[in-house]
């Protein structure tokens, strides 16, 4: 910072959230990494400015007013998280990923320092891209193994973590991998994780979660989360990290790979919608959508209904709770004039209209679902 000032951010790599007090200019300067892997909260009210990696750190300050941000309840009840900088605590905000701030003489200024851009080099062949991705992936894994303590890996039965473990094992054959499962085998991934670790010769340290421990842990889990977050995957992750902490202090995981490499089914579905849009005029698609919606269920109905919608309207995740505002609002005492779940994401889609639909979905996920749910859960539980 002393050498480059704010320009230092262009030289940083990896995950971070920090604040630096510049005593020469009496300015507080801080930033958060480009994906928002590490959390950064702040509270700016009544002449107070507080910041921390956890909201609970503010509770000790006498100037902090603890209030429920009830206007955000509709979002929480619809999509299980708040898709913007607000939190469930009134006046407590998240510094967005890829943003920096300065605080001077009571004035807070926030600005973006990095934007995710998509520039496809059409001259490269598929083989060229495969080679480039493999080399970049290997270099990234190697770079993130640099530590002054032992580094381990989380391992599920999925492609993402398996690739990471396999890459680490090339240079560190006896790297410890960690996996968690359930007592009920039909829900457990342990047999697959153990089979893979055995195949590549890596030790796999496991633990299991039963129904009693699942529910008993919830009180601790909610305390660590700071905000209500009903993603059930946080429970096994809590037990996984708790077990791993007995052996290592640093782990690599496969979080974020679906958003980067198009792993979610809705990305491939978007390719089919693109083809449908090319072949069928918009007015016809909208007419077909209206007719299909009124008919009893039949094979392909869901596709035809969504095929007449805008991209942001058919952005539906599996974790939507109440899709119909009327159904949701009957559980709320006040009328918050809240939106349908997909409407919360329209401003994000508006920023990337120039991209094809699958890439739009990836971009929106990186700036909402990944940032405010996936990465937050991973940080809190670890």
Residue ranges and their predicted role:
Residues 8-10, 32, 89-93, 229-230, ...:
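Short Gly/Pro-enriched turn/cap motifs at secondary-structure boundaries
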Residues 21-127:
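N-terminal segments that mediate ammonia production and transfer
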Residues 23-50, 118-343, 377-382:
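ATP-dependent adenylate-handling active sites, centered on carboxylate activation for C-N bond formation
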Residues 4-8, 59-67, 86, 123-124, ...:
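Short, polar/flexible loop-turn hinges at active-site or ligand-entry regions and domain interfaces
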Residues 342-350:
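A short, charged helix-loop
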Residues 1-26:
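Catalytic core of PPM/PP2C metal-dependent serine/threonine phosphatase domains
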